[in-house]
Structure formats: C-alpha cells, structure tokens
Amino acid sequence: DILLADFGISLSYSALSSILKNAGFESPKKKKIRHRTHRRKRKPHPGQFIQIDATPYEWFGDRVKYTLHGAIDDATGQVVGLFLTQNECLYGYLETMHQCCMDFGIPQTVYSDNHTIFRSPKTGKLTVDELIAGKTIHLTQFGRSMHELGIDLIFAKTPQAKGRIERLWATLQSRLPVEFAKRGIKTLSEANRFLETEYRKLFNQKFSVTPEAEPIFVPLSKGIDLDSILCVKHTRKTDAAGTFSFKNRCFQILD
C-alpha cells in the first residue's frame, strides 16, 4: 500500500515478500499453524452490533506500550471509533463511543468482554434495600452511559467470541506504527488527532464491506447532550445544612 501510494510502485504481496526475504529481511510476524474455524455470519444491519475492545502495543516503536481502544461495526467491518491512552481505561472507551455516536449514530448493541469497566463485579449481588427500591442490576459508569443512550450491552464469554475485533488488532498492529513513523507522530495527542480525522476514513475505505441491509444507527437528536451522558456521574445526599462530601472533601450548596 505504501509503495503504491507514496512511490507509484505496484507489486504483489508474494513478489515483495520474496524481494525482502532475499535481502535478509524476515517478517516480524511468526507464522503459526492455523486451525480452520467457522466465522460467525455478519449481522445484516450497520449499527446492529458493535464490538468494542482495547489492545496494548508499542505503537510508536519506542518499546513503550500504549493502549488503543476501538470499536468495529459487525455488518460492514467499519471502524467506528479509535482512541489511544496510556492504559486501558473508562476514558478511552467513552471517547471511542463518542466518536461512534457523533460520526455514525447510536448503535443498537455493544459487545464487550467482562472487564470491570463494562461489567460490575457486584452483578447479581443486590442488597435487600436495593431490591426493595426496584434496582435490578449494578451498572458501571460505562454501563450506565449505554443505558442512558438506549444501547444494549452484552458480554463475550471467550476472546474467540470477539474474532472480528481481534483480527482488527492484528491488522492495526502491523500498519499503524508505520503510519505514525511516516508522519513523525510520537505523542498521544498527535496520534489521536490523526486517528480521528484521517486514519479511520482511510482504513474504512480499504477494508469495509457492503452490508446486507440498511443501517439502523439512530441519529443523535438535538436534545441529546452527549457529553453529559458519556461521562462519570456520582450520587450524593445532602444533610440538613445543605452540604455533601465527595472524595474526603465537603461541599456546600449555595442558595
């Protein structure tokens, strides 16, 4: 791709591989004996099923690992969000979903692993008072955000169940470091700007497929304040004096 785009040289993969091998360059990817597995059929509608995950990698080629958060549409293979942070975190996932909702719309379902960012360890452990109050499940901050947007959040039981996004990581790990190096990108802010404004579009043009049916992403209505949903919220009670505590600090509500 780079030879064609930057130098106008068109070579087949096998020809290029042979040239590099004869010059003493071996592929960094270890070849493994692969057992054939049955790939799940794609969902028909774009927006019906979004896989979300994160992967640590040496994206800048400096032996320091950063974590790339991403989301991919099952029907088209389009990357709907990418965001790079130091470690896997809620912020990275919320930014990824912000891109998805702004650029494509609100999806029907988000499919994740069982990380505590997505699934509370207290799931299924409601107290009697919580049951009496009508609470049915413990939600994480991410889960609460999805609930407010009307998105169903379901969890994968095994890494193999997230095959589509696992294959995305393999592709990005072989391509993104080269793209960063070409452009002299060495910081998180530079990388995230490139990912959101340029790379997602380039990637989707090359790798996305035509869906079987019409998109069912729900467009954002004018009344939705996305920043007030994709955020962290805490509930506190005030005392008779109109004060409440948060993280060992006391706050006074003014009239």
Question: At which residue positions do the language-model features occur?
Answer:
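Cysteine/selenocysteine-centered motifs that mediate thiol-based redox chemistry or coordinate metal-sulfur cofactors
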Residues: 106-123, 130
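Short, charged, surface-exposed loops that flank catalytic or proteolytic processing sites
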Residues: 53, 179-195
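RNase H-like two-metal-ion nuclease catalytic core shared by retroviral integrases
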Residues: 112-114, 127-175, 188-192
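C-terminal, beta-rich DNA-binding module of retroviral/retroelements integrases
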Residues: 198-255
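Residue-level detection of beta-strand-connecting loop/turn positions
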Residues: 62-63, 114, 248
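Short, conserved catalytic/metal-binding motifs centered on acidic residues
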Residues: 16, 53, 77, 110-113, ...
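Mobile-element integrase/transposase regions
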Residues: 21-79, 86-108, 143-148, 242
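Basic, flexible linker segments flanking DNA-binding modules
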Residues: 1-58, 128-137, 214-225
